[in-house]
C-alpha cells in the first residue's frame, strides 16, 4: 500500500489554514483486510475554524485572576478534526477482529519503545512492526532530533506497518505535556506546562496551547499524546508531579484539563489522561519506588477521581493507569492500581463508564520492573482490564512480554473475549482518527511557527508569579547593577554561545552579569560552583539563584546542595533573589529566601518572560496554583 500526502500551507487574514489532500493508491492484490472507509478528506475540503477557547468553557470570576489581552491569532484547520461517523460499525469491526490471529491481537495491545532515529538504525523497530505487529510506538528523546527527522521516522514505520501482515496503522505516541516534559525540544514550539498555564488563570490558554501543540504533533505524524496530567497536586512536596499538574484544586484541574483534552482531540491528536486514579498526593516518585495513596474512598471521590470523571464525560480517547497502591480501592496489600481489577475494571470501566482505551504506565518503571518483571506485570495489567501495555527496554524484554500475554490467553488466564473487546477499542480509535486513510506526516511549516512562538511567549509571561518580595528586588532596583547569576545547565543557551539565554537578555538590557552554570549531575561542577560563588559573592550587588529540581533531588537522592548554597549566601548577608524554574514547592525547603519568582519551567518563552519581569518591562501577573504555608505564617 502506498500513501501519498500532498499538503499546502496558506496564510490568510484570520490566521493559518492547513489544506490537506490525500491520494490513496492500492492495487487489488494489496487490498488490506479491513472494513472500507470513507476517504478522510473530500476533494473539496471545508475548513473548520477552531476558536482559542471552546464554546463550553467556564471562565473564572471577574477579578479573580490577572488577565492579559488575547493576541493569539485564530486557527483554521481542515481535514484534521475527528470524524466519528466514518468509523466502521461494531459488526464490521467484529468481523475484522475475528479474522485476526491471536498473535496479531496481542501485538495491537502493545506500545513499544525502541532505539534509533531511523528505521535503518533500528533492527528492533523493524522486528516489532513487521514480525510482532505491535499496535503502537512510544517516541523518546533518543528517537527525536528535530521535526524533519521525526516525520521521516514516523513515515518509515507507518509504511512498514502497511506492508506487514496485519496492515494496521500504528499509534505513534509521545510525552508532550509542555514545559520541560517534552521529548522533542528542537524545532518545535515550547509551550508552558500545565501549572504555568493554570497560573495565568485563563482556561482559553489551555485550549490554545493544546490545539497548537496538536497541530505540530500531527504534522510530524504523531497521533497520540500521553497527556494531559490530571493529577490533583495537593501535596506541594510531591517529587514527581509538581508543575506537571494544573494545581491543588480538583475544580481547577478539571477546568483546565477539559480545555486541554478538547484542544488535542479537536485537532486530530488522541489525548491520554493520566495517572489514574491520581498521583498528586504522593511523596514517592513511582519511577523509583511504589507510592501509596492513603486516602479514604470519599476523599478519593472528591479530589483524585473528579478530573477523570470529567475526562470520561468529555470523551477522552485514553486513560493511563498509575503504578501506586490505593488501599481504599484495592484491598490486596501492595498491589498497584495498574494491576488491580477492582480499580481498572471496577472503578474506571464499570463505575465511571469509561468506554475508551485504558493504557498502563510504562512497565519498565522502578518498583514494577523490580517487583514483578515486565512480562508478568503485563499479564497482571491485562487481567485487570488494561487494553494497551507500555513496554520498555530491549527487544528481548518486549518479546518476552508478548509471549507471556499469548501464553496467558492460551491457558485461559485471560479470556479471548476480553482480548477481542480491547482490540475493537483500539481499531475504533485508529479509524476515528483517520489512521487507515492517512497516518503519515504532513506539512511541517506549522511546527515552531512564528505565530505559535508568539502565543507561547504570551502565555509564559502571563504565568510568571511573584510568590513574595520582602526585599523589594522585583523589578531589579537601580542599586542592583552588578549581578552574579547562578543558572542550572537546563536553561537554554545564549544565541552568542556565551552562557545562558537569561544572562544574555540581562546583559542586553545594560546589566553587568557574571554567570556560573551548574550541572547537578556532575559533582565536580557542583563543588566548583559552590566554592566560586561563596568566594565571589561579595563583589556583586545581588545574587540571582536559579533553582532546579530541588524537590525531586531532595526526595529521591537526599541531595541538599542547593539548600546548602542558598543558606551560605544568605548567611553572608548578600541579597538573594531566587527564580524557581520548576516546582514552586521548592520554596518550602528554603523558606528563608526573601524574594521568590516562579517561572514553572525553562522553555525559551519562560526564560524571556522572567527576564522581562526582572528588568521591569512587564509585571508578574500569575497566581500560584498551590498553597504554600511557610514557617511562622
Report the location of each language-model feature:
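Second-shell residues forming the walls of enzyme active-site clefts
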Residues: 101, 121, 146-166, 180-182, ...
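Short acidic, glycine-rich surface-loop motifs adjacent to enzyme active sites
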Residues: 128-147, 226, 236-237, 312-335, ...
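Solvent-exposed loop/turn segments at secondary-structure junctions
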Residues: 115-119, 143-146, 176-181, 224, ...
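A substrate-binding/cap region within the structured catalytic cores of diverse enzymes
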Residues: 194-222, 229-261, 265, 443-453, ...
Amino acid at each position: 500500500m502506498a500513501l501519498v500526502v500532498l499538503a499546502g500551507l496558506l496564510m490568510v487574514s484570520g490566521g493559518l489554514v492547513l489544506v490537506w489532500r490525500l491520494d490513496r493508491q492500492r492495487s487489488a492484490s494489496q487490498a488490506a483486510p479491513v472494513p472500507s472507509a470513507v476517504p478522510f478528506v473530500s476533494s473539496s475540503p471545508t475548513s473548520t475554524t477552531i476558536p482559542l477557547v471552546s464554546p463550553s468553557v467556564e471562565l473564572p470570576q471577574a477579578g479573580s485572576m490577572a488577565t492579559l489581552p488575547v493576541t493569539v491569532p485564530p486557527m483554521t484547520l481542515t481535514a484534521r478534526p475527528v470524524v466519528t461517523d466514518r468509523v466502521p460499525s461494531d459488526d464490521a469491526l467484529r468481523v475484522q477482529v475475528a479474522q485476526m490471529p491471536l498473535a496479531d491481537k496481542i501485538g495491537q495491545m502493545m506500545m513499544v519503545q525502541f532505539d534509533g532515529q531511523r528505521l535503518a538504525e533500528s533492527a528492533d523497530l523493524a522486528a516489532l512492526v513487521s514480525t510482532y505487529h505491535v499496535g503502537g510506538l512510544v517516541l523518546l528523546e533518543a528517537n527525536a532530533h528535530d521535526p524533519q527527522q521525526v516525520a521521516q521516522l514516523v513515515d518509515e514505520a507507518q509504511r512498514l506497518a502497511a506492508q506487514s501482515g496485519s496492515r494496521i496503522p500504528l499509534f505513534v505516541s509521545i510525552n508532550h505535556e509542555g514545559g520541560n516534559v517534552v521529548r522533542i525540544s528542537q524545532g518545535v514550539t515550547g509551550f508552558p506546562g500545565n501549572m504555568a498555564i493554570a497560573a495565568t488563570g485563563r482556561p482559553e490558554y489551555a485550549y490554545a496551547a493544546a490545539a497548537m501543540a496538536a497541530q505540530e504533533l500531527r504534522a510530524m505524524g504523531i497521533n497520540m499524546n500521553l497527556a494531559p496530567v490530571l493529577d490533583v497536586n495537593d501535596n506541594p512536596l510531591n517529587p514527581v508531579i509538581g508543575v506537571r499538574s494544573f494545581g491543588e484544586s480538583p475544580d481547577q484541574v478539571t477546568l483546565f484539563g477539559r480545555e486541554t483534552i478538547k484542544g488535542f482531540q479537536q485537532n486530530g491528536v488522541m489525548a491520554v489522561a493520566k495517572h489514574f486514579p491520581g498521583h498528586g498526593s504522593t511523596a514517592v516518585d513511582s519511577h523509583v519506588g511504589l507510592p501509596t495513596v492513603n486516602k479514604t474512598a470519599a476523599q478519593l471521590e472528591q479530589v483524585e477521581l473528579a478530573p477523570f470523571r470529567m475526562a470520561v464525560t468529555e470523551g477522552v480517547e485514553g486513560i493511563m493507569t498509575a503504578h501506586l497502591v490505593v488501599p481504599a480501592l484495592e484491598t490486596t496489600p501492595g498491589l498497584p492500581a495498574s494491576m488491580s481489577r477492582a480499580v481498572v475494571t471496577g472503578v474506571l470501566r464499570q463505575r465511571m463508564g469509561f468506554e475508551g482505551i485504558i493504557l498502563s504506565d510504562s512497565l519498565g518503571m522502578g518498583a514494577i520492573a523490580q517487583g514483578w518483571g515486565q512480562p508478568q506485570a503485563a499479564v497482571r495489567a491485562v487481567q485487570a482490564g488494561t487494553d494497551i501495555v507500555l513496554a520498555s527496554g530491549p527487544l528481548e524484554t518486549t518479546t518476552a512480554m508478548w509471549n507471556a500475554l499469548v501464553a496467558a490467553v492460551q491457558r485461559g488466564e485471560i479470556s479471548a473475549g476480553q482480548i477481542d473487546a480491547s482490540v475493537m477499542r483500539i481499531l475504533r480509535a485508529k479509524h476515528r482518527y483517520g489512521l487507515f486513510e492517512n497516518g503519515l506526516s504532513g506539512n511541517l511549516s506549522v511546527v515552531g511557527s512564528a505565530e505559535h512562538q508568539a502565543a507561547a511567549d504570551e502565555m509564559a509571561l502571563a504565568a510568571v508569579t511573584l510568590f513574595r518580595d520582602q526585599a523589594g528586588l522585583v523589578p531589579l532596583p537601580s542599586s542592583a547593577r552588578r549581578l552574579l547569576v547562578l543558572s542550572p545547565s537546563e536553561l537554554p543557551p545564549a544565541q552568542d554561545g556565551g552562557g545562558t539565554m537569561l544572562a544574555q537578555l540581562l546583559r542586553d538590557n545594560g546589566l553587568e552579569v557574571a554567570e556560573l552554570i551548574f550541572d547537578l549531575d556532575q559533582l565536580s561542577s557542583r563543588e566548583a560552583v559552590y566554592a566560586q560563588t561563596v568566594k565571589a559573592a561579595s563583589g556583586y550587588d545581588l545574587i540571582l539563584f536559579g533553582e532546579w529540581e530541588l524537590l525531586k533531588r531532595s526526595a529521591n537522592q537526599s541531595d541538599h546542595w542547593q539548600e546548602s548554597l542558598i543558606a551560605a549566601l544568605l548567611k553572608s548577608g548578600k541579597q538573594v533573589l531566587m527564580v524557581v524554574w520548576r516546582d514552586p514547592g521548592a520554596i518550602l525547603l528554603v523558606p528563608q529566601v526573601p524574594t521568590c519568582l516562579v517561572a514553572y519551567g525553562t522553555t525559551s518563552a519562560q526564560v524571556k518572560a522572567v527576564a522581562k519581569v526582572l528588568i521591569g518591562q512587564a509585571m508578574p501577573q500569575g497566581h500560584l496554583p498551590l498553597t504554600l504555608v511557610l514557617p511562622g505564617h
